[in-house]
Amino acid sequence: MPYKISRAAYAGMFGPTTGDKVRLADTELFIEIEKDFTTYGEEVKFGGGKVIRDGMGQSQVTRADGAVDTVITNAVIVDHSGIYKADIGLKNGRIAAIGKAGNPDMQPGVNIIVGPGTEAIAGEGKIVTAGGMDSHIHFIAPQQIEEALMSGMTCMLGGGTGPAHGTLATTCTPGPWHIARMIEAADAFPMNLAFAGKGNASLPGALTEMVLAGATSLKLHEDWGTTPGAIDCCLSVADDYDVQVMIHTDTLNESGFVEDTIGAIKGRTIHAFHTEGAGGGHAPDIIKICGQPNVIPSSTNPTRPYTVNTIAEHLDMLMVCHHLSPSIPEDIAFAESRIRKETIAAEDILHDIGAFSIISSDSQAMGRVGEVAIRTWQTADKMKRQRGRLKEEKGDNDNFRVRRYIAKYTINPAIAHGLSHEIGSVEIGKRADLVLWNPAFFGVKPDMVLLGGSIAAAPMGDPNASIPTPQPVHYRPMFASYGKSLTNSSVTFVSQASLDAGLKGRLGVAKELVAVKNTRGGISKASMIHNDLTPEIEVDPETYEVRANGELLTCEPATVLPMAQRYFLF
């Protein structure tokens, strides 16, 4: 007779299984395990007296004959594709298999072979997600990269050269010389990195040379002059070389209004940064473009979610970030035109219905690089409390809402920027850039961050202690953050044209250079998983009220948020 144990005892030993529910941090979001790939009674687990021992759950199979490098056991996978439990096998820095791990010589249904050369990571009671991607980075300070890594981000895309004033305001690495220096610098950091060139030009020559120098994308920013002519020129170069274009439109409406920008885009695919407008863009109605089928709209995290402090904070941030002076009335008017509680409130709802597709940081330039995940889940929690269950939900859980929101900082930015063949989801064949979370700390403080299958960061106690847990416990770089392991565990993304032109040999960098692809006509708003809605947006020019398909979008600011002070006492 098989031995029977209670669900509680089973969850305590092997983690939750099909039908069990897990609360995410201190939010009101509850996930339910949809499927468990294990064979009950044949689970593998590492430890004294446990299963992964020689002749038991560990086989004699060599790596050459199919054993994996690492197995993550009994993990709850939270991904855009579903919420399920499985073992994960890693090999050659990639996800080799998802399913049932063990010894095929004595266990049924094994598709992940554990051998003497296999390392074990205990996923029991843990959540595994794909590493996050932050697609709106001002590379102002290299220290941002460690901050982002420790928050669960494994890819950063943006522009800059350090604390130059152009970088403080705009996400552009201008010109081939600066792009080369940034690609060289990338070898020092445990992070997948990608750099954007400056897209503001009326003739294509300077833009073309930036793409050939390795830019994965081109950024149009109003501080450099986002005119209709510059928009058209930039998109034409992008179409020629298969790179994405990101746009920050003309707040002052000097060279045209939102309709003129839409006209200049001419139906071509484009990623619209901070589409609500507080981060910049046609005042007061840039938010309209989230209804365009060719526009991929995103948010930056300072407006996520709308709270009682959002408006006051933004005015001061904006003055600093855009080199404005509080003693100049025109500068104050410029700042005030961008900060509108009505459009920020509407942004919450547009995220919840899947009309906004991506959340990013805007690091040190009106955004916090370590809070992409936190702000995403705070928005999801606020919307559940204010709007209730989504109509797409099945069963007594929040699975669909969770899948919608995790897509905003994993798969969708990866698709938008031509990286989804490598990153963005927990999927066989993709890079093993994975994050383990204790559910109580989900989205706030990871348990472990893997880059290319190696541990790059984790909380760790006193290195002189007799065990790993004594205080002070804080995040520390792990072995994938050092030496050649660093350059073999992460990559730098570049354009295909730059690879074809011999960029790697020319720069002599150690990291693998990987080309972006399918950023233009092959994708659109419809490609944004769980976030592809294109409502018709109207903005009242006097009251700033926002309507989607005729429905007024409004909500109250939050006075209390989850995932906040409770988690940051020390």
UniProtKB/Swiss-Prot annotation:
<feature type="active site" description="Proton donor">
    <location>
        <position position="322"/>
    </location>
</feature>
<dbReference type="GO" id="GO:0005737">
    <property type="term" value="C:cytoplasm"/>
</dbReference>
<dbReference type="GO" id="GO:0009039">
    <property type="term" value="F:urease activity"/>
</dbReference>
<dbReference type="Pfam" id="PF01979">
    <property type="entry name" value="Amidohydro_1"/>
</dbReference>
<keyword id="KW-0378">Hydrolase</keyword>
<keyword id="KW-0479">Metal-binding</keyword>
<feature type="binding site">
    <location>
        <position position="221"/>
    </location>
    <ligand>
        <name>substrate</name>
    </ligand>
</feature>
<feature type="binding site" description="via carbamate group">
    <location>
        <position position="219"/>
    </location>
    <ligand>
        <name>Ni(2+) 1</name>
    </ligand>
</feature>
<comment type="pathway">
    <text>Nitrogen metabolism; urea degradation; CO(2) and NH(3) from urea (urease route): step 1/1.</text>
</comment>
<feature type="binding site">
    <location>
        <position position="274"/>
    </location>
    <ligand>
        <name>Ni(2+) 2</name>
    </ligand>
</feature>
<feature type="binding site" description="via carbamate group">
    <location>
        <position position="219"/>
    </location>
    <ligand>
        <name>Ni(2+) 2</name>
    </ligand>
</feature>
<dbReference type="InterPro" id="IPR017950">
    <property type="entry name" value="Urease_AS"/>
</dbReference>
<dbReference type="Pfam" id="PF00449">
    <property type="entry name" value="Urease_alpha"/>
</dbReference>
<comment type="subunit">
    <text>Heterotrimer of UreA (gamma), UreB (beta) and UreC (alpha) subunits. Three heterotrimers associate to form the active enzyme.</text>
</comment>
<feature type="binding site">
    <location>
        <position position="362"/>
    </location>
    <ligand>
        <name>Ni(2+) 1</name>
    </ligand>
</feature>
<dbReference type="InterPro" id="IPR029754">
    <property type="entry name" value="Urease_Ni-bd"/>
</dbReference>
<dbReference type="InterPro" id="IPR011612">
    <property type="entry name" value="Urease_alpha_N_dom"/>
</dbReference>
<dbReference type="GO" id="GO:0043419">
    <property type="term" value="P:urea catabolic process"/>
</dbReference>
<keyword id="KW-0533">Nickel</keyword>
<dbReference type="InterPro" id="IPR011059">
    <property type="entry name" value="Metal-dep_hydrolase_composite"/>
</dbReference>
<feature type="binding site">
    <location>
        <position position="138"/>
    </location>
    <ligand>
        <name>Ni(2+) 1</name>
    </ligand>
</feature>
<dbReference type="InterPro" id="IPR050112">
    <property type="entry name" value="Urease_alpha_subunit"/>
</dbReference>
<feature type="domain" description="Urease">
    <location>
        <begin position="131"/>
        <end position="570"/>
    </location>
</feature>
<comment type="similarity">
    <text>Belongs to the metallo-dependent hydrolases superfamily. Urease alpha subunit family.</text>
</comment>
<feature type="binding site">
    <location>
        <position position="248"/>
    </location>
    <ligand>
        <name>Ni(2+) 2</name>
    </ligand>
</feature>
<dbReference type="GO" id="GO:0016151">
    <property type="term" value="F:nickel cation binding"/>
</dbReference>
<dbReference type="InterPro" id="IPR032466">
    <property type="entry name" value="Metal_Hydrolase"/>
</dbReference>
<feature type="binding site">
    <location>
        <position position="136"/>
    </location>
    <ligand>
        <name>Ni(2+) 1</name>
    </ligand>
</feature>
<feature type="modified residue" description="N6-carboxylysine">
    <location>
        <position position="219"/>
    </location>
</feature>
<dbReference type="InterPro" id="IPR006680">
    <property type="entry name" value="Amidohydro-rel"/>
</dbReference>
<keyword id="KW-0963">Cytoplasm</keyword>
<dbReference type="InterPro" id="IPR005848">
    <property type="entry name" value="Urease_asu"/>
</dbReference>
<protein>
    <recommendedName>
        <fullName>Urease subunit alpha</fullName>
        <ecNumber>3.5.1.5</ecNumber>
    </recommendedName>
</protein>
<dbReference type="InterPro" id="IPR017951">
    <property type="entry name" value="Urease_asu_c"/>
</dbReference>
